[in-house]
């Protein structure tokens, strides 16, 4: 079973029986109280989906936030390091970031300076992903230079849409070319596009649209050639890949071979590009999304994430007791893969 989880992407034929056996094999090691589980891991988790709520932004969250509050919660749940990013808690907040105004650009710079300060004050406990002033391409290129060269960010964060465009749009290609040149880590955070708000009365937009919009973003990158032509960007997809793993067959089957250089290898090439993505598991450690993620991608691509403080740690930690995995795969998810992406936290 170890080979089943650790094998290369081309060897990902996990049957239902395989999956049940894998869960059973890991149960003895992982169906334990949190303190015992954490004690088995010599180094704590690295959380790549962890939000900061700066004091100069009046943003509602169900939990009070400060760096100290995060540290206390991280210690409680066995997390050694968190990589901070801004949040798309509401569509309005994402709109503020992407309204292309000087006010929005100033706020983004403040956010980035704040994230850098928190990380420099706690260099072993926090990193940060810089925000970009989309959709202003020139401003984004300048912010990339500032945040990487001056602030020493650990990567960048983008929302999955800019209101009416998705990241694979040719307008944004210079941004991806620059990130590719820098071999950057890029974390996508879900948003709700203007087209798809209030579609189902009584259902919050984020319930469905966060994961559907993430899937749109990844497909836009795939079909416009960004994944194939910018191979040095390490892309992190939220929520165990959102709907990408479940829809990967449809995505590959509907790729047109005439896309040529956009997706070398046609349908087979499309699937390989999806398998190269990294998948963090915030609020997605239930059996079905984990099974889909593991069917698509090898264990080298799994990352820990919690979406704290928007969601409590328990929503990600708790379901793992019902969906255990082999200890080596659990370690890769908890820490091992992130330590490769961010060597300074190794």
Please give the residue ranges for each predicted region.
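Aromatic-anchored helix/helix-loop segment that forms the rim or "lid"
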Residues: 259-291
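Acidic-and-aromatic substrate-binding clefts and catalytic sites of carbohydrate-active enzymes
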Residues: 60-64, 133-140, 163-170, 244, ...
């Amino acid at each position: 079973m170890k080979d089943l989880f650790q094998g290369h992407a081309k060897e990902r034929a996990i049957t239902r029986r395989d999956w049940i056996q894998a869960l059973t094999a890991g149960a003895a090691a992982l169906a334990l109280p949190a303190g015992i589980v954490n004690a088995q891991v010599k180094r704590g988790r690295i959380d790549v989906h962890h939000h900061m709520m700066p004091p100069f932004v009046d943003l509602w969250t169900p939990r009070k936030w400060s760096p100290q509050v995060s540290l206390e919660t991280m210690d409680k749940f066995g997390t050694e390091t968190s990589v901070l990013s801004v949040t798309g808690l509401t569509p309005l907040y994402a709109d503020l970031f992407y309204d292309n105004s000087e006010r929005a650009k100033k706020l983004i710079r403040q956010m980035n300076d704040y994230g850098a300060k928190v990380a420099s004050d706690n260099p072993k406990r926090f990193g940060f992903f810089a925000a970009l002033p989309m959709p202003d391409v020139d401003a984004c290129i300048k912010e990339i230079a500032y945040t990487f060269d001056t602030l020493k960010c650990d990567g960048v964060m983008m929302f999955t849409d800019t209101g009416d465009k998705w990241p694979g749009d040719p307008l944004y290609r210079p941004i991806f070319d620059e990130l590719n040149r820098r071999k950057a880590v890029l974390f996508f955070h879900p948003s709700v596009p203007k087209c798809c708000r209030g579609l189902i009365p009584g259902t919050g937009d984020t319930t469905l649209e966060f994961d559907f919009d993430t899937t749109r973003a990844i497909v836009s990158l795939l079909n416009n050639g960004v994944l194939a032509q910018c191979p040095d960007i390490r892309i992190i997809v939220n929520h165990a890949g959102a709907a990408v793993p479940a829809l990967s067959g449809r995505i590959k089957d509907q790729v047109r071979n005439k896309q040529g250089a956009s997706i070398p290898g046609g349908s087979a090439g499309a699937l390989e590009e999806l398998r190269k993505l990294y998948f963090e598991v915030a609020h997605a450690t239930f059996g079905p999304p984990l099974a889909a993620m593991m069917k698509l991608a090898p264990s080298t691509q799994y990352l820990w994430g919690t979406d704290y403080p928007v969601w409590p740690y328990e929503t990600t930690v708790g379901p793992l007791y019902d969906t255990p995995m082999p200890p080596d795969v659990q370690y890769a998810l908890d820490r091992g893969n992130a330590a490769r992406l961010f060597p300074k936290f190794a």
